Swiss-Prot record:
The gene is rpoB. Transmembrane segments: none annotated. GO terms for molecular function: DNA binding; DNA-directed RNA polymerase activity; ribonucleoside binding. It comes from the Bacteria. It is an enzyme of class 2 (transferase). Coiled coil: none annotated. It comes from Coxiella burnetii (strain RSA 331 / Henzerling II). Its EC number is 2.7.7.6. This is DNA-directed RNA polymerase subunit beta.
């Protein structure tokens, strides 16, 4: 008994789906230290920070909307007497008008209204000067447009479609130093440059030219000497030299020159004179180059003065201006070169000493000094004017204009901002300790940038690597939306400033001042049409998740495809654990669009960081720390698969690790960190590929990209060989239904699950604890695939919080299931699998293994035209009865009708212009009053190539237009459905309430009540059963506390009913009110068709290892090769597809899949023999004991659960082989042995047609195959008479335009080569652009006369016209 208790107690810790079907984990590492983080965190967190919706106005942090408002407000009028201040904002009332589903149906944006509290302060103009007196304060809430909200799954619904805003990887603001790699100048000299990139504002570039002078550019304009900007900052020549150079001090006598010697500065120079020590011993001979050894000797000899000849001074540069003390005149300017003449002058004026700049080829070049000579400006004003001329060419400069322009460029918070990130990067790069500061530049900043740049030119320091992830940061949805919002606010600011300056501002309210249009327009434009706001890829749950985790280097403020070179696209060492090195598109975007790695996240500054386990004194701890690429370089980081003993100590003497971006071997005592998991470096899609470590990178890339194109099949099947990520993806993608609280399943049907919540989970006594989950049924996804959820729980099942209750598309018992497990044989088969073709068995079609449902949406819009309104009706001119058979009286197709290409879905007629009538027609009109002929048929028809079943019709009518029968019918049906749902919900909640009441009342002593309940009697269950439930509330109890609870329950009961009524009223109003349709639209009808697509030749299939192919033929089951026991294989692949592609993972997967299936078969046989739970438990134990880590605890399951588990394992025991930590060959062999299968993984096959055995054994096994969304039905296309191009009169191209096949230049050559003259003439005239000829030919065919007269092609006329446009008169001569 004790054992059973412990078992049931433990049972709760295993999740419900795992009890139903658990994977055998073949990973080697101990339990993951870090659970895979929530995969959509980046998106949701970023947008939450932007909205700060549920945070009180006072507590909001300085980012998102709040920051945008604070940066623009307060707005002051030009006079300064009126100020508009920002107080706070609120988002949406109680809830948004429509929920996500309704917004999708009605084509609306899921958004909340933004209301901003503003305060208008007016100052008294009559107040005495210097004192501001407030005259009036008005506060008001102003509506500022709608802000889109994010759905729970991280997407946005804009105009009825789900969109995703992709994060952008852009260059971080800050300062960067780089060189041109020797490309600019022919000599190959490296030209260094520095660039200050702000978050917003002007760019500032400093660069060297080939002559080593420094220049500055502002906003990529014409270059100026760099010292101009220093002068504009207020520095003079002496100060500039002082900042960049040390000086040498010389004493002048009439004959000699004496230098105050600093020995270090002599290094590398030629000794002009002998240098002797005090004893007269020569340390350095004349004309010898002075080395470091000489310098040590000079220092030892303590020589501090050195007499030198005059010519040593020639060419040296004066550091400080020299003034004649007697006359006050300047003898020599700072930065002047010393000549013999100047030296003579200095001696003549008895100058005793002078300072020269210490310039040395090795460590201190003459760059700034040379630049000063190029600089024509002499003072601050001239410098400002020079800058003004460059920025505003052609405008006359004034002192004020020049000053304000320069001030606004880099020093005004409105126009320039480095942002916190930029300031942090800037300070770190120029070597400051303090990482915070002003968002604008200061004088010191500009000087520091120049200093570092000069140092780099002198060989001290390195240039930056722009592709390092410490120099690129992530901009997510929230940040981009905030920037757009700010742009809108700045536009508003201008208008408000003008209005504040009006005379009657005192009579205005904040609402009259602010126009919300620019703000909502900016937001709308961003979410609707920005390059980074993309139509969500909704093929399957994986493609949704991947799309939300995508990181793009393109987009506004990013790179362009054409300009991006090889380096930006390449894998960088800092991508490790941050960005996936595998998953990126093939084609022009390769490397520019990446995917976040599994554990990566963005830090507060937007830099990607990845977690590591701390290692202290050789011992690996369980503590994890996130490091960004900047911090990571300073540590030794070991791999995840490093050998560790039981106590967590590092075992090996040398350990492979990463340090400063290099892979090295080092001793264990140096290790600081260790990876958290082997799959840390890859993205979600790549982490789903088993045996990824055995695949070539190119194929792995294709594999991870193709998984995203898999179409959800009707009966999803989880892979037999997975990686353990399947469950995480299915749960995080949001396609499944997850239990919010733990409890017991109360009722289940196809569209609703009701859970009675555990008592301990309910917050208060009022909470009766019922959770109702409504499932999504057969709705259309963005890619026209079908979204349908179905329950996996049964009544009475216990579920925990976070368990999966219902599967969605491509999920199977809470695990991702993109394809099907097929029995595959690697062998050629009559050439049908030549060049990657695939041969499949008819069984797959028969069992609907790859049948998919696609839902198409057709929309018909009736508009108001100039000639009158269009009408939706079944009365269509010139259309036979048969064509109208599927329409109802209102002209709309019935639900359930099967329609083919060309069938009418919605009948619509459009008024056509009155034509001139003949007298006879006029007479007929007058007699019969016939008006039918003045409308034309513009009905919505099924597009070519589609056959399907109508599954739903939606009608939206403009407010005030009479609704037709069908609309009322649909509304009535919807309303009754809603009412039923609400009543069911009420019933369930009331049942729970009365159940709780029964527990409360039973056994209590009554003080009276209905049905002559006497005082002092105990209340029994039978008494309550006889009493109508409503009357229970009339019972009076003696216990006060219980009475209070009874009263509270009564209140709760009333509340439930009121809530139901309010919801019903709300739904009724929503259903009956007309939609706000676009202007000029009267009615919109949407028809949904479900198309069932079986797999057929021409469809594209693929495995998970980049092994893709097209189905060449479908072979009857009896003709397929079969195994010795008679099992025919499902699919035959070409063995030649493996060696050159080097994706060996598929072979290992095949072997392991076969073992998994074999084990399942053995369990199935046991069940058929009637094995009981004990036997099943014993046979499952050795299988689950194969897990070295994360062992599944069979003991925790009760007997019925063991039986269910075994039944679910009959199709095969699912195995997980984690990425870079997967099953070894030995383990695969062991599993094959356990399944009684040959350990070679090969078996004898027999030819299905002859029954003969194939010569040698064939690799057979189970592989997971996907059907990709490249279906032959979507590509097949044939043109009859269709549309023509306007100018050339040639048929259009492409399936979408119902176009033809282009008969191009080369095809014409082919016919010419054959000499097929008539065919050629036909191709170039009547089949193309001979307008008269093709109409004649059509007529002839109708008349049964199959002749053609070729005429003049239209393209010839176009050519003639083009030549005429060159003013050459050219024309045809008619004979």
């Amino acid at each position: 008994m004790a054992q059973a208790n412990s078992r049931s107690r433990n049972s709760a810790t295993i999740s419900y789906p795992e009890k139903r079907r658990a994977r055998v984990n073949l990973g080697k590492r101990e339990v993951e230290i870090l659970k895979t983080p929530y995969l959509l965190e980046t998106q949701i967190e970023s947008y939450r920070k932007f909205l700060q919706k549920d945070i009180a106005a006072e507590k909001r942090e300085d980012n998102g909307l709040h920051a945008a408002f604070k940066s623009v407000f307060p707005i002051t009028s030009y006079s300064g007497y009126a100020v508009l201040e920002y107080v706070g904002y609120s988002l949406g009332g109680e809830s948004t008008l429509f929920d996500v589903e309704e917004c999708k149906l009605r084509g609306l944006t899921y958004a909340a209204p933004l209301k901003v509290n503003m305060r208008l302060v007016i100052y008294d103009k009559e107040a005495p000067a210097g004192k501001k007196a407030i005259k009036d304060i008005k506060e008001q809430e102003v509506y500022m447009g709608e802000i889109p909200l994010m759905t729970e799954t991280g997407s946005l619904v804009i105009n009825g479609t789900e969109r995703v805003v992709v994060s952008q990887l852009h260059r971080s603001p800050g300062v960067f130093f780089e060189h041109d790699k020797g490309k600019t100048h022919s000599s190959g000299k490296l030209l260094y440059s520095a660039r200050v990139i702000p978050y917003r504002g002007s760019w500032l570039d400093f660069e060297f030219d080939p002559k080593d002078c420094l220049f500055v550019r502002i906003d990529r304009r014409r270059k100026l000497p760099a010292t101009v900007i220093l002068r504009a900052l207020g520095y003079d020549t002496e100060q500039i030299l002082d900042m960049f150079y040390k000086t040498n001090h010389f004493h002048l006598n009439q004959e000699t020159v004496t230098l105050d010697l600093i020995p270090q500065r002599l290094r590398g120079e030629l000794a002009v004179v002998e240098i002797k020590d005090k004893k007269g011993k020569v340390i350095v001979e004349a004309n010898r180059r002075i080395s470091a050894r000489h310098i040590r000797l000079i220092e030892k000899a303590e020589i501090n003065k050195l007499e030198l000849p005059d010519d040593y001074l020639y060419g040296k540069v004066i550091g400080k201006t020299i003034i004649d003390k007697e006359t006050g005149e300047i003898i020599a300017h700072a930065n002047e070169e010393i000549t013999a003449e100047l030296l003579k002058n200095l001696r003549a004026t008895k100058t005793a000493s002078l300072d020269t700049l210490y310039i040395n080829e090795i460590e201190c070049g003459p760059y700034v000094s040379d630049t000063l000579r190029l600089d024509t400006t002499t003072n601050q004003l001239e410098a400002l004017v020079e800058i003004y001329r460059i920025m505003r060419p052609g405008e006359p400069p004034t002192k004020e204009a020049a000053e304000s322009l320069f001030e606004n460029l880099f020093f005004s918070p409105e126009r320039y901002s480095l942002s916190a990130v930029g300031r942090m990067k800037f300070n770190r790069r120029v070597g400051r300790k303090e990482l915070t500061g002003l968002d604008v530049l200061s004088k010191e900043d500009i000087v520091d940038v120049l200093r570092v740049l000069v140092d780099i030119r002198d060989g001290k320091g390195d240039v930056d690597d722009i592709d390092h992830l410490g120099n690129r940061r992530i901009r997510s949805v929230g940040e981009m939306a905030e920037n757009q919002f700010r742009v809108g606010l700045v536009r508003v600011e201008r208008a408000v400033k003008d209005r504040l300056s009006l005379a009657d501002v005192e009579n205005l309210m904040p609402q009259d001042l602010v126009n919300a249009k620019p703000v909502s327009a900016a937001i709308k434009e961003f979410f609707g049409s920005s390059q980074l706001s993309q139509f969500m890829d909704q093929n399957n749950p994986l493609s949704e998740i991947t799309h939300k985790r995508r990181v793009s280097a393109l987009g506004p403020g990013g790179l362009t495809r054409e300009r991006a070179g090889f380096e930006v696209r390449d894998v960088h060492v800092t991508h490790y654990g941050r960005v996936c090195p595998i998953e990126t598109p093939e084609g022009p975007n390769i490397g520019l669009i990446n995917s976040l790695a599994v554990f990566a996240r963005a830090n507060e500054y937007g830099f990607l960081e990845t977690p590591y386990r701390k290692v202290v004194d050789r011992v690996v701890t369980d503590e994890t720390e996130y490091l960004s690429a900047i911090e990571e370089g300073d540590y030794y980081i070991a791999q995840a698969n490093t050998n560790v003993d039981g106590k967590g100590r590092l075992v090996d003497d040398l350990i492979s690790c990463r340090y400063k971006g290099e892979f090295t071997l080092t001793t264990p005592d140096k290790i600081n960190y260790m990876d958290v998991s082997p799959r840390q470096i890859v993205s979600v899609a790549a982490a789903l590929i088993p045996f990824l470590e055995h695949d070539d990178a190119n194929r792995a890339l294709m594999g991870s990209n193709m998984q995203r194109q898999a179409v959800p099949t009707i009966r999803p099947e989880t892979p037999l060989v997975g990686t353990g990520m399947e469950r995480t993806v299915a749960v995080d993608s949001g396609v499944t239904v997850i239990a919010k609280r733990s409890g017991v399943i109360d009722s289940v049907d196809a569209s609703r699950i009701v859970v009675r919540v555990d008592r301990k989970e309910t917050e208060d006594d009022d909470d009766i604890g019922v959770d109702i989950y409504n499932l999504t049924k057969f709705t259309r996804s963005n890619q026209n695939t079908c979204i349908n959820q179905h329950p996996i729980v049964e009544v009475g099942d216990k579920v925990q919080k976070g368990d999966v209750l219902a599967d969605g598309p491509s999920t199977d018992i809470g695990e991702l299931a993109l394809g099907q497990n097929l029995l595959v044989a690697f062998m050629p088969w009559n050439g049908y699998n030549f060049e990657d073709s695939i041969l499949i068995s008819e069984r797959l079609v028969e069992e609907d293994r790859f049948t998919t449902i696609h839902i198409q949406e057709f929309t018909c819009v009736a508009r108001d035209t100039k000639l009158g309104p269009e009408e939706i009706t079944s009365d269509i001119p010139n259309v036979g009865e048969s064509a109208l058979a599927k329409l109802d009286e209102s002209g709309i197709v019935h639900i359930g009708a099967e329609v083919n290409a060309g069938d009418i879905l919605v009948g619509k007629v459009t008024p056509k212009g009155e034509t001139q009538l003949t007298p006879e027609e006029k007479l007929l009109r007058a007699i019969f009053g016939e008006k039918a002929s003045d409308v034309k048929d513009t009905s919505l028809r099924v597009t070519p190539g589609i056959t399907g079943t109508v599954i739903d019709v939606r009608i939206f009518t403009r407010e005030g237009i009479k609704k037709d029968e069908r609309t009322l019918e649909i509304e009535k049906a919807e309303l009754s459905k809603v009412e039923k749902d609400l009543n069911d919900e009420l019933r369930v909640r009331e049942d729970a309430l009365f159940e709780n009441l029964e527990k409360l009342l039973t056994g209590r002593v009554a003080a009276g009540g209905p049905n002559k309940l006497a005082k002092g009697t105990k209340i029994t269950k039978s008494y309550l059963a006889d009493l109508p439930r409503q009357k229970w509330f009339e019972i009076r109890l003696q216990d006060d506390a219980a009475t209070k609870r009874l009263e509270a329950s009564h209140e709760h009961f009333k509340e439930l009913r009121e809530t139901r009524d309010a919801k019903l009223k709300d739904s009724r109003q929503k259903l009956t009110q007309g939609g706000d349709l676009a202007p000029g639209v009267i009615k919109i009808v949407k028809v949904y068709l479900a198309v069932k697509r079986r797999i057929q030749p021409g469809d594209k299939m693929a495995g998970r290892h980049g092994n893709k192919g097209v189905i060449s033929t479908i072979v009857p089951i009896e003709d397929m090769p079969y195994l010795e026991d008679g099992t025919p294989v499902d699919i035959v692949l070409n063995p030649l597809g493996v060696p050159s592609r080097m994706n060996i993972g598929q072979v290992l997967e095949t072997h392991l899949g076969w073992a998994a299936k074999g084990l399942g078969k053995k369990i199935g046989e046991m069940i058929e023999k009637g094995a009981d739970a004990k036997e099943l438990r014993n046979s499952l134990k050795p299988i689950y004991d194969l897990s070295k880590t994360q062992r599944f605890d069979l003991e925790a399951l009760e007997d019925p659960e063991i039986v269910t588990l075994a039944k679910n394992l009959r199709k095969g025991v699912p195995i997980s082989s984690p990425v870079f930590d997967g099953a070894t060959e030995e383990e695969i062999k062991q599993l094959l042995k356990m399944a009684d299968l040959p350990t070679s993984g090969q078996a004898a096959l027999y030819d299905g047609r002859t029954g003969k055995k194939f010569d040698r054994s064939v690799t057979v096994g189970y592989m997971y195959m996907l059907k990709l969304n490249h279906l032959v039905d979507d590509k097949m296309h044939a043109r009859s008479t269709g549309s023509y191009s306007l100018v050339t009169q040639q048929p259009l191209g492409g399936k979408a335009q119902f176009g033809g096949q282009r008969f191009g230049e080369m095809e014409v050559w082919a016919l010419e080569a054959y000499g097929a003259a008539y065919t050629l003439q036909e191709m170039l005239t009547v089949k193309s652009d001979d307008v008269a000829g093709r109409t004649r030919m059509y007529k002839n065919i109708v008349d049964g006369d199959h002749r053609m007269d070729a005429g003049m092609p239209e393209s010839f006329n176009v050519l003639v016209k083009e030549i005429r446009s060159l003013a050459i008169d050219i024309g045809l001569e008619n004979d």
